[in-house]
Swiss-Prot record:
Divalent metal cation. It holds the Pfam family RraA-like. It catalyses: 4-hydroxy-4-methyl-2-oxoglutarate = 2 pyruvate; oxaloacetate + H(+) = pyruvate + CO2. This is Putative 4-hydroxy-4-methyl-2-oxoglutarate aldolase. A divalent metal cation binds at D97. Keywords: Lyase, Metal-binding. One of its GO terms (biological process) is regulation of RNA metabolic process.
Amino acid sequence: MTWTTPDLCDRFPEVAVAEPLFRHFGGRTTFSGPIATVRCVEDNSRIRELASTPGDGRVLVVDGQGSLRQALFGDQIGAQAVANGWAGVLIHGCVRDVEILAGLPLGVLALAACPRRTERRDLGDVDVPVNFAGVAFVPGHWLYADANGVVVAATPLSLEIAGVEH
């Protein structure tokens, strides 16, 4: 049985729902997994580092402070994330190389596209709680994303256990 974010919201009213700010850029529009976080401003050093580690089906949530001046994520980091088993990324900022990202088997949500890359200054924080789009994203909590939106829960959700019928 597959899930949708509307079904999750109906069955689990306690879930947090992100404000509808994000566009899909990846080859997968439906993805979920435990959250890992990065907080950075126009420096993707920590994103690159984390994407090169085993993802184990996690979702990388990046608080880029909503900057639209530089892209935090592109084809190279996207390819690393796929190779290392990440389920997807949610970026409060920009991506680039959108034609290539669209062909990757990876969920990619971001505010917009920007062709300018970041500078790498080795700055940023990993695995810290971040807040944007009206939601607290906590490492280890679960993110569910599809064409309807983004939902966050403290624990994994299962519609099969919940007995929801379609």
